[in-house]
Amino acid sequence: VGNYAVVKDSWRGKEVNYYVEPEYGPVAKKIFGNTPEMMTYFSKLTGVDYPWIKYSQMTARDYVAGAMENTTATLHQEFAQQDARELTDENRWEGTIAHELFHHWFGDYVTAESWSHLTVNESFADYSQTLWFEYKYGKDAGDAENYWGMRAYLQGDNTKKDLVRFYYSDREDMFDAVSYQKGGRILHMLRNYLGDSAFFKGLNLYLTTNKFKSAEAHHLRLALEEVSGKDLTWYFNQWYFGSGHPKLNINYSYQQEKKQAMVVVKQTQNTGKIFRIPTYIDIYHGKNKSRNMVWIENAIDTFYFTSETKPDLINFDSDKVLLAEKTENKNLDNYIHQYYHSGNYMDRREAVDFCGRKIEEPKAKALLLDAFADSFHGIRGLAISKIDLKKETQREVFEKKIASLVATEKNRPVKASMLTALGNTNNKEYSIIYLPLVNDSSYTVAGAALAALEIVDSAKAIDIAKAFSKQTLKKRLNTVVTTILTKYGDEQMFDFVASTYGKLNIQSSEKFEMTMPFAQLLIKTTDPVKFKKGIDLIVEFREAIPQGYRVQTDPYFNFKILGDIIKAKKQKGETELVAMVTAVLPKM
């Protein structure tokens, strides 16, 4: 219940509506406007037209989940709402919009028969994000989405959890990176193994056979087996009814006397489990490639390939789809060849990562310079992130190139990364680049420009920050303005900074970034009422973080943020304020 702007759209004669708070009415179609195209794409992909009479999407304040796929009426948290300047960077909610829509096939049309099989809902919804980005923005974008999903799984403590879990403490435990991101990556591998035709025809059979009913992982297996003609029992036993993932050590060598390339793959996971893995190994001589399908089935597998000369590159998992941790003995020349000739997103990403670690090598520098002009913004941004222009050996190679690219870079986050890199030069000449960009339509670019300007002309940056403080600010510009006013201001800035901090969404990175500057302002604050309000805001943020993350975040809040405030206040002899902070720390 609330005051909403209702923005109407349609798909094949069916109502498609977007409910947003009135101020977001003018940009509702920029947020949700790809929905009809998604409906067309997912209908074609599954072979099942969107099966419901209408589709509405609405936002709500303080919603406990990110979003929920209520049939025909998806509810999104308020973080979905973005103004025009935020959308200049990207639509941060586009993946979630695709995710919840795809649930109308996998979750609503066919529903998981129990919490244990939740992944047949959530893995498909998660994977829909990869599918959508691949379709809409190209294979690199889809591969990047897939990579970040794999990272989310690998970074957590998830190796002991089966994808289908019959034992769990609470049903909420099932909503994790295993059911979602790991499940999505397992589908990606399965698609690669079966091929697109069999995979998507299998999904169609699964949906049409089980429509308006409940189903489990075995129903999915049977549908895919019927269409593909392949036995998938081993795959489902390994990935759906098992836990963990392979850790692979891959060693490449060449035996000149035998004219033979050798690949040794060792599984090093300490679980007692050996994975069965179909994959491809590509062997390159210049631009020429030979492809070889192999099966990894033992603790150590060795493969031999006839090769008249030493290969320029041997590329294991050449489609880059395996859910695995890999260690390879490739050298710089191998990765350079991989970047220019293998070509998919992960091939290029791996090469840029390696060159970042070998950045003092001339060949690595040359590749990074080329990567600044990569066709995909994700690779351009990654290459920029490897550069530290505080170091003279890097400045002399990269500085002028980055400065020349700022004006022509179309992707706003990459442009912002370039500005941040230039800021590290402490070169006053770049003020002519920074000053116009503090008014850029992108909050991210404007914030990066203002932060860089503050390094070379703090007085000018302070004046601009004061002027901006009277406007509605978000994202990085908000953080930078607040940081500058906190750094150079005094207690008089408390009301503005506290108000800004309190309004930030707890899911935004800006809230974390602002916590330290806000704490520094509280160190300067002597008014007990204002000081307590500030401490309460920090504690409110600490307590609002989901319980599963607090083992990581609580030490930061308690020992770094609040601990630093206590230390500073003790040095100043402000015992009353020390007591206020001590009272909100956990009892030891």
Residue spans for each PLM region:
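Acidic/His/Gly-enriched intrinsically disordered linker/tail segments
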Residues: 67, 122-185, 189
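Zinc-dependent metallopeptidase catalytic helix centered on the HExxH motif
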Residues: 36, 76, 82-143, 203
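Structural detector for internal amphipathic alpha-helices that build alpha-solenoid repeat scaffolds
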Residues: 320-324, 347-359, 370, 380-393, ...
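Amphipathic alpha-helical scaffolding segments comprising HEAT/armadillo-like alpha-solenoid repeats
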Residues: 328-338, 360-372, 392-407, 427-439, ...
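Amphipathic alpha-helical substructures
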Residues: 24, 169, 176-263
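Short inter-helical turns and helix N-cap capping residues of alpha-solenoid HEAT/ARM repeat scaffolds
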Residues: 343-344, 375-377, 410-411, 441-442, ...
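Beta-strand-rich binding/interaction modules
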Residues: 232-233, 243-317
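Hydrophobic helix-coil surface modules that form long, contiguous segments used
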Residues: 1-98, 127-130, 329-333
